């Protein structure tokens, strides 16, 4: 957003410094439309660059958690994952799947995705992914909504989270939806366990 603000300031100062006189009343709305279009284009490329940056960062974060070892490896890794950018967390899951040789589908944007944070294919079947960073128990309604989504789309689902799975949420789990959390999630992200051995 700072880039856009700088751009707007630049255009406004340019008009003032050049003492541009616009006599035609139709020029002002035309200029306004062009102005808005340029801002939209800049915003689009800004969001796209943010997406590329997060994908690139996800591979670095995977390397980082691989380096976390020792007696408190589990607690340290979970604590680390709970603090990172939630969108990078989504990309980390997809990046690990890609590194494990699966066909992945990244979203073009992070909002308005309909509850889907990515997709991948395994054994000819399409899986939807939902990734959530929790510090405590997961929200049951999130699980129910995701389960309804995959049922309507007739696909399988992978619900990945950093929290705790309560009994109410576990009751929703079925043959079409798998939870990936706790040690299994860490082993997967560290490439010590393949996703095919989990789903």
Task: Describe the residue ranges of each PLM region.
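Mixed-charge (Asp/Glu-Lys/Arg
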Residues: 1-114, 119-199
């Amino acid at each position: 957003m700072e880039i856009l603000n700088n751009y707007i300031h630049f255009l406004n100062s340019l008009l003032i410094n050049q003492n541009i006189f616009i006599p035609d009343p139709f020029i002002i709305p035309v200029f306004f439309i062009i102005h808005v279009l340029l801002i939209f284009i800049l915003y689009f490329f800004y969001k796209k660059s943010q997406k590329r940056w997060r994908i690139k960062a996800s591979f670095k974060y995977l390397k980082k958690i691989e380096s976390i070892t020792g007696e408190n490896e589990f607690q340290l890794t979970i604590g680390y994952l709970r603090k990172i950018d939630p969108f990078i967390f989504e990309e980390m899951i997809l990046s690990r799947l890609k590194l494990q040789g699966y066909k992945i589908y990244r979203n073009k944007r992070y909002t308005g995705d309909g509850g889907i944070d990515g997709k991948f294919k395994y054994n000819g079947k399409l899986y939807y992914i939902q990734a959530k960073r929790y510090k405590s128990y997961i929200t049951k309604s999130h699980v129910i909504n995701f389960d309804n989504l995959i049922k309507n789309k007739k696909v399988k689902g992978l619900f990945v989270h950093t929290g705790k799975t309560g009994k109410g949420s576990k009751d929703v789990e079925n043959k079409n939806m798998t939870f990936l959390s706790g040690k299994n999630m860490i082993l997967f992200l560290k490439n010590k366990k393949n996703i095919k051995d989990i789903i």
